[in-house]
């Protein structure tokens, strides 16, 4: 089972396409949608929804996959549920870069402060990151340097921020899920 978490643009048609591509790894791909506008509510909703979905699966190794803001959540919700995560062009600092886009971006800082201290150290090797070299939204070199001590980093020379084509990375994602 793969949980797919969309980015800030929840209605993008690319979400369906990415889910279809992920079905080459596992036919059971589930969209876990969230508002993107209310971080504290989103966290509660995502924790509840993932726990509910996991009760109805016998997959020994479910995987979280998120793009952009979805990768922010995939890392945290995956950690809290003991799941591996794939973080694609993750938005690591929504409290800074979501100003003016959502009602309460400061809630992300509050979530970070209340999260398990040093959670990345406790989550080492349980996530892999895929970064676009040409991401038009974030400085992925900086973000990769924040995560490289904890997770493997793969680079893509072609895809933009929304990462519409996962095909080149599906074998690595599958191997990571099954390892």
From Swiss-Prot:
Gene3D superfamilies: alpha/beta hydrolase. It comes from the Bacteria. InterPro entries: AB_hydrolase_fold (IPR029058), UPF0227 (IPR022987), UPF0227/Esterase_YqiA (IPR008886). Signal peptide: none annotated. Belongs to the UPF0227 family. HAMAP family: UPF0227. This is UPF0227 protein Sbal_2415. It comes from Shewanella baltica (strain OS155 / ATCC BAA-1091).
């Amino acid at each position: 089972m793969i949980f797919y978490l969309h980015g800030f643009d929840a209605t993008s048609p690319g979400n369906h396409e990415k889910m279809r591509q992920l079905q080459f790894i596992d036919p059971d791909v589930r969209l876990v949608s969230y508002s993107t506008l209310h971080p504290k509510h989103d966290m509660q909703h995502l924790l509840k929804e993932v726990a509910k979905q996991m009760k109805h699966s016998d997959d020994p190794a479910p995987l979280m996959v998120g793009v952009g803001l979805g990768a922010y959540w995939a890392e945290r919700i995956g950690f809290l549920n003991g799941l591996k995560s794939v973080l694609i062009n993750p938005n690591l600092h929504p409290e800074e870069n979501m100003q003016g886009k959502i009602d309460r971006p400061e809630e992300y800082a509050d979530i970070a402060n209340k999260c398990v201290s040093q959670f990345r150290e406790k989550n080492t090797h349980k996530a892999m990151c895929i970064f676009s070299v040409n991401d038009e939204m974030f400085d992925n070199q900086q973000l990769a340097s924040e995560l490289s001590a904890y997770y493997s980093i793969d680079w893509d020379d072609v895809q933009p921020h929304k990462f519409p084509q996962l095909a080149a990375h599906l074998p690595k994602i599958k191997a990571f899920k099954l390892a």
